[in-house]
């Protein structure tokens, strides 16, 4: 299906381009979201008449997105989640969770603006892209931890899961050396009289 793009669509074209796309893409994505018009003669004439207005509106929206993006770009958000000892989350962090964390601190984003290739399933510091406009994308940092103390340690660059693993290993080694030093089967106070 031939369509006229009303804004920049990644991988398809920019404002004003007449492009041929698959029918499903046009019907299910571009047309319902007002990102394109069917490329018939009436719409082509109408678009040419309104082109300056549409371009001005697009520039205005891009500038507004750029201003809101200045406050978000590079900002770090802490998310406290439950996780196992290996650092694997019980559940995952999806786009909705990221949007909620940003909104909680005063950001104006929608979950459809969050760009995640796949849900986040591990503790640590993760970078996430937020697409505020077709031409404005910012990066925010998510610090996912089990507690605020852990989040602070991760923010300083410490790998909390590796540190926990080393602490556990040291404790096991100490317990093993205590057992070896005490001797097997000689426990004081285990004397029973009959």
Curated annotation (Swiss-Prot):
GO terms for biological process: translation. It holds the Pfam family Ribosomal_L9_C. It comes from the Bacteria. PROSITE patterns: RIBOSOMAL_L9. GO terms for molecular function: rRNA binding; structural constituent of ribosome. Residues 167-194 are annotated as: Disordered. Keywords: Ribonucleoprotein, Ribosomal protein, RNA-binding, rRNA-binding. One of its GO terms (cellular component) is ribosome. Belongs to the bacterial ribosomal protein bL9 family. PANTHER family: 50S RIBOSOMAL PROTEIN L9. Binds to the 23S rRNA. This is Large ribosomal subunit protein bL9. It comes from Caulobacter sp. (strain K31). The gene is rplI.
